């Protein structure tokens, strides 16, 4: 499905919240959307690895990495696993790496920046809790839509207007 966030904002002004303009598109999909799954971790992508190995059909993984710019929470190998398991995309409040490969992967990826160093792997983090960044709170089970215009969230699923 192709989403256009300005059209969704116009059609559903009472439902959508717009994430502050701080994320950039790194994935092979320019637009993506789905039900939110949340994860909170700081400079440790162990739980990201676990989640992308699960079925992600119709889902978007929202990763609150604390805004760290000191390591990447997603690279080409995990992105490939996410695409293989049907994830629509990932939104990362942190960094990614292997950006040339990410751009060729059939996956939506929005993140703060690229950084070549990988994260630690200590198994530290939390799943399925509300996470807040970019001026909005992402809640598990709600919906996220993203394109090159930005990222929006809604408590219920949205359909593109005719």
Swiss-Prot record:
GO terms for biological process: regulation of RNA metabolic process. It comes from the Bacteria. It holds the Pfam family RraA-like. InterPro entries: RraA, RraA/RraA-like, RraA/RraA-like_sf. Its cofactor is a divalent metal cation. It is an enzyme of class 4 (lyase). Coiled coil: none annotated. It catalyses: 4-hydroxy-4-methyl-2-oxoglutarate = 2 pyruvate; oxaloacetate + H(+) = pyruvate + CO2. The keyword Ribonucleoprotein does not apply. Catalyzes the aldol cleavage of 4-hydroxy-4-methyl-2-oxoglutarate (HMG) into 2 molecules of pyruvate. Also contains a secondary oxaloacetate (OAA) decarboxylase activity due to the common pyruvate enolate transition state formed following C-C bond cleavage in the retro-aldol and decarboxylation reactions. Homotrimer. This is Putative 4-hydroxy-4-methyl-2-oxoglutarate aldolase. The lineage of its organism: Bacteria, Pseudomonadati, Pseudomonadota, Gammaproteobacteria, Pseudomonadales.
């Amino acid at each position: 499905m192709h989403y256009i966030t300005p059209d969704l904002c116009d059609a559903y002004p009472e439902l959508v919240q717009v994430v502050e303009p701080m994320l950039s598109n790194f994935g092979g999909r320019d637009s993506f959307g789905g039900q939110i799954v949340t994860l909170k971790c700081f400079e440790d992508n162990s739980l990201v690895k676990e989640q992308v190995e699960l079925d992600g059909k119709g889902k978007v993984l929202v990763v609150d990495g604390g805004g760290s710019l000191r390591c990447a929470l997603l690279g080409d190998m995990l992105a490939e696993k996410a695409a293989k398991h049907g994830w629509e995309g990932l939104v990362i409040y942190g960094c990614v790496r292997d950006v040339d490969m990410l751009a060729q992967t059939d996956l939506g990826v929005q993140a703060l920046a690229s950084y070549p160093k990988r994260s630690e792997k200590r198994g530290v983090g939390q799943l399925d809790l509300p996470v807040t960044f970019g001026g909005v709170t992402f809640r598990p089970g709600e919906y996220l839509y993203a394109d090159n215009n930005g990222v929006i969230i809604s408590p219920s699923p949205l359909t593109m207007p005719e």
